[in-house]
Amino acid sequence: MADLSTLMPALVLGVCALAGYLLGSVPFGLVLVRLAGLGDVRGIGSGNIGATNVLRTGRKDLALATLVLDSGKGAIAALVASALASRIAGFEDAVLAGLLAGGMAVVGHNFPIWLGFKGGKGVATTLGTLLATAWPVGLAACATWLVVAALFRYSSLAALVCLALAPAYALVLATPAHAAVFALLALLAWIRHRANIARLLKGEESRIGAKKKAAP
């Protein structure tokens, strides 16, 4: 029979994964829009609960708050998990705990238990995880988003490109373990952006700052 010291790393990782998922499941965009008296954000624009769709309410402050809070879900989950695990399971397990908790926060954001597993696309939460677990990679990804967004004016394209490059950045700036986790998160983001990809290919995706044409 395995002793407690043998089981402890697995137990710690399990708790970190669950806590990360539950934190990620908190739908800050939905909560903020409702508190502002603007109804259900899922009935606006794309129906997404993230910052981009919150911006369609016309409230930049709510969109910014959503962006910060959604990013914070990944960052806080990763940092807290890593700090706690480092005291129990050792440094290597602490790194894995941070990656796992941050990754599960992204899963929670995309498939929140509180909303019937229908959530967002996880870009902000993923970037928060990158910044918390390997900040040089996170900064490189954020810089990539800014460059692509400035050049092409597509938020979705900027997100897809920056997350696709994150694993490559991690191989240079972090570790293969970081690269593997970031690759999985990038794949999840691409899957969640299927409709955006289709619109990009058709030239129908909305550009950043574009005004909708008034109905005749």
Swiss-Prot record:
Keywords: Cell inner membrane, Cell membrane, Lipid biosynthesis, Lipid metabolism, Membrane, Phospholipid biosynthesis, Phospholipid metabolism, Transferase, Transmembrane, Transmembrane helix. Coiled coil: none annotated. Its EC number is 2.3.1.275. One of its GO terms (cellular component) is plasma membrane. Its main location: membrane. The keyword Cell inner membrane applies. GO terms for biological process: phospholipid biosynthetic process. It is a multi-pass membrane protein. InterPro entries: G3P_acylTferase_PlsY. One of its GO terms (molecular function) is acyl-phosphate glycerol-3-phosphate acyltransferase activity. SMART domains: G3P_acyltransf. It catalyses: an acyl phosphate + sn-glycerol 3-phosphate = a 1-acyl-sn-glycero-3-phosphate + phosphate. Pathway: Lipid metabolism; phospholipid metabolism. The chain crosses the membrane at residues 11-31, 62-82, 95-115, 132-152, 171-191. It is found in: Cell inner membrane. Catalyzes the transfer of an acyl group from acyl-phosphate (acyl-PO(4)) to glycerol-3-phosphate (G3P) to form lysophosphatidic acid (LPA). This enzyme utilizes acyl-phosphate as fatty acyl donor, but not acyl-CoA or acyl-ACP. PANTHER family: GLYCEROL-3-PHOSPHATE ACYLTRANSFERASE-RELATED (PTHR30309:SF0), INNER MEMBRANE PROTEIN YGIH (PTHR30309). Probably interacts with PlsX. Belongs to the PlsY family. This is Glycerol-3-phosphate acyltransferase. It comes from Rhodospirillum rubrum (strain ATCC 11170 / ATH 1.1.1 / DSM 467 / LMG 4362 / NCIMB 8255 / S1). The lineage of its organism: Bacteria, Pseudomonadati, Pseudomonadota, Alphaproteobacteria, Rhodospirillales.
